[in-house]
């Protein structure tokens, strides 16, 4: 920071102290997007219902329900909605005049809690000066009213109304939410995580807490062959190989050829029904065989990690060396194998890749690390994401903090050192950064730790004793499929346990919370997202369509503004086209969690504390120079 003279110091101190007394901006929390771009994009566009609330507050005496719906959708989808309205009937001069006036009023209301400087930075370059005049100099009782009227009239007469309204709409979207928190799992079974990443990269202010599915993509890019196999297997399982081929330019020709030559029809490996597009019969056959091939490659690679990392304590997960013909024996039980596809598994060296398998996985890694679009997305994740974040008296973490049954922190040993609680998650963060920094290394300790984060018992992202992928594919006995959850998930409804976790992460304040994602809230079974008397909140977004029959809703999001915390339960989203055509918003039900006695100000926030330090440092500097 440049050295300031006395006058500049005085100006900066006054500015900082003034900012501290503005209302805190609105934070928007989402999680578990699972590649469902359209639903997520809609939630961003409507601010989890905040824009509709603003429209209703400002115009409830002026507009009927249909008119308010139309105004909302002009804000959500300005290009598409305006084109639709133009096609239905010519939009009159009076319509444009009223619409612009209303949108400017929403902008004015939405910008009240921000400094003029911050709003100016958000203004579109083309209309920056005009909008600043309309926002800050407006007073309909003064002689300037004709001045404002002339600005709007000229915009319409010059044929710029559509463009101006579009800019206003996106400005409202930006002002209504100050900061976005994405609490994990951008990636998974949904078809368009790449579009979500593009959307996030254009967002004005955000942070990301990594989920387990984000981790395997980052790990694959960082050199983990086992995680790379998992990524490809999941894409094949959910009929999303086009994500790799078309969106990330990964050539799967060699893998497909090997799969078709080596594996037979095996219905257990048929891709799940894709809710967005019907796969052709040829695509289904390819996905079925690719899934078999990559599942076996995955088992071999994971066995290699377990063999070279005894301190991971995962030897009980080894399976390929336990196969005897059509049976397998482990945990003192013998089972008959089903859906067998072990053609490339050697009895002598079951975890050794064949020459073709090795060529395929090595080639896939080279392509992953060379894909321009994937590189852009993974760099952005590393720039914005972490395993947890403490922000405004809230601990944001996707999965869990591993606990013992008595609520104490579970300890795990890595490289001869024991880690538990916050230190355990910090260790994993260190391993992530180390592995990402050396992508050419595929079997180093840090890279193997990223795979452990995907499926290890002590992982804060996984939160279970074991991942039963092998059992689900190859054993009929349902009891072997069960994945035992860490005690965290039964203890997180206990205030004492949550308080201990918050203390561990040095989260202070009267209204502190843990905000979790990862686990769908089964509302149909009476489960609540509010745990431990409101100390912990679960906001699994429920965007994945496959979960919605289980949960009964399309998940939760959270808003945290100057008036407190507000949990929002969402109904399912039909489609973008249907929504725009029928003004069909996502139906949301809001529930106030915390409402402080006094309105929260910037000085009560994490950023506010930093601004206060800057002000105090400047004041100290002034005194020293006197």
Curated annotation (Swiss-Prot):
Stated name of the protein: Fructose-1,6-bisphosphatase class 3
A GO molecular-function annotation: fructose 1,6-bisphosphate 1-phosphatase activity
E.C. numbers: 3.1.3.11
Species this chain originates from: Enterococcus faecalis (strain ATCC 700802 / V583)
InterPro entries: FBPtase_class3, Metallo-depent_PP-like
Superkingdom of the source species: Bacteria
Keyword match Hydrolase: yes
Pfam families (alphabetical): FBPase_2
Family per record: Belongs to the FBPase class 3 family.
Swiss-Prot/TrEMBL cofactor(s): Mn(2+)
Reactions that this protein is recorded to catalyse: beta-D-fructose 1,6-bisphosphate + H2O = beta-D-fructose 6-phosphate + phosphate
């Amino acid at each position: 920071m440049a050295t300031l003279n006395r006058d500049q110091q005085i100006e900066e101190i006054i500015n900082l102290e003034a900012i501290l007394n503005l209302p805190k901006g609105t934070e928007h929390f989402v999680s578990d997007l699972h590649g469902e771009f359209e639903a997520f994009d809609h939630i961003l566009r409507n601010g989890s219902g905040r824009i509709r609330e603003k429209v209703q507050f400002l115009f409830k005496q002026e507009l009927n329900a249909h008119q308010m719906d139309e105004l909302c959708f002009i804000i959500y989808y300005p290009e598409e909605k305006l084109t639709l309205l133009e096609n239905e009937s010519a939009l009159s001069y009076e319509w444009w005049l009223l619409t612009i006036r209303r949108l400017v009023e929403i902008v004015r209301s939405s910008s009240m809690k921000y400094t003029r400087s911050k709003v100016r930075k958000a203004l579109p370059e083309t209309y920056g000066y005009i909008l600043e005049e309309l926002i800050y100099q407006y007073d309909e009782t003064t002689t300037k009213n004709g001045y404002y009227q002339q600005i709007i009239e000229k915009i319409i007469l010059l044929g710029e109304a559509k463009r101006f309204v579009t800019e206003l709409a996106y400005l409202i979207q930006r002002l209504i939410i100050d900061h976005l928190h994405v609490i994990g799992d951008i990636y998974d079974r949904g078809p368009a995580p790449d579009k979500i990443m593009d959307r996030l990269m254009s967002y004005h202010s955000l942070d990301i807490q990594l989920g387990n599915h984000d981790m395997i993509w980052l790990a694959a890019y960082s050199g983990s062959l086992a995680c790379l196999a998992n990524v490809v297997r999941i894409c094949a399982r959910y009929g999303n190989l086009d994500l790799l081929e078309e969106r990330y330019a990964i050539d799967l020709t060699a893998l497909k050829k090997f799969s078709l030559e080596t594996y037979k029809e095996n219905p257990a490996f048929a891709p799940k029904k894709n809710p967005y597009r019907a796969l052709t019969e040829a695509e289904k056959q390819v996905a079925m065989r690719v899934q078999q091939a990559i599942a076996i490659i995955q088992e071999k690679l994971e066995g290699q990690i377990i063999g070279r990392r005894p301190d991971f304590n995962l030897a009980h997960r080894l399976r390929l060396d336990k196969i005897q013909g059509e049976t397998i024996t482990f945990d003192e039980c013998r089972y008959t194998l089903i859906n067998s596809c072990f053609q490339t598994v050697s009895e002598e060296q079951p975890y050794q890749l064949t020459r073709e398998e090795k060529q395929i996985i090595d080639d896939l890694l080279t392509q992953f690390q060379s894909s321009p679009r994937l590189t852009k997305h993974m760099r952005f994740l590393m720039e914005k994401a972490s395993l947890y974040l403490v922000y405004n008296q809230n601990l944001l973490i996707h999965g869990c903090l591993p606990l013992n049954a008595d609520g104490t922190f579970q300890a795990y040993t890595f490289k001869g050192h024991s880690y538990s609680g916050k230190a355990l998650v910090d260790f994993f963060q260190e391993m992530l950064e180390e592995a990402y920094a050396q992508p050419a290394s595929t079997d180093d300790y840090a890279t193997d730790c990223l795979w452990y984060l995907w499926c290890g018992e002590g992982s804060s992202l996984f939160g279970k004793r074991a991942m039963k992928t092998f059992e689900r594919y190859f054993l009929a006995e349902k009891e072997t499929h069960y994945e035992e959850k860490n005690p965290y998930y039964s203890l997180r409804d206990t205030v004492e346990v949550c308080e201990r976790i918050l203390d561990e992460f040095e989260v202070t304040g009267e209204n502190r919370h843990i905000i979790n994602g990862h686990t769908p809230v089964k509302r149909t079974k009476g489960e609540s997202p509010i745990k431990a008397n409101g100390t912990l909140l679960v906001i699994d977004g429920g965007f994945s369509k496959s979960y919605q029959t289980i949960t009964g809703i399309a998940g939760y999001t959270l808003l945290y503004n100057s008036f407190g915390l507000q949990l929002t339960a969402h109904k399912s989203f039909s489609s973008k086209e249907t929504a725009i055509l029928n003004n069909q918003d996502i139906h949301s039900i809001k529930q106030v969690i915390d409402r402080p006695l006094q309105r929260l100000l910037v000085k009560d926030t994490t950023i506010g504390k930093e601004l206060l330090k800057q002000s105090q440092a400047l004041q100290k500097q002034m005194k020293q120079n006197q």
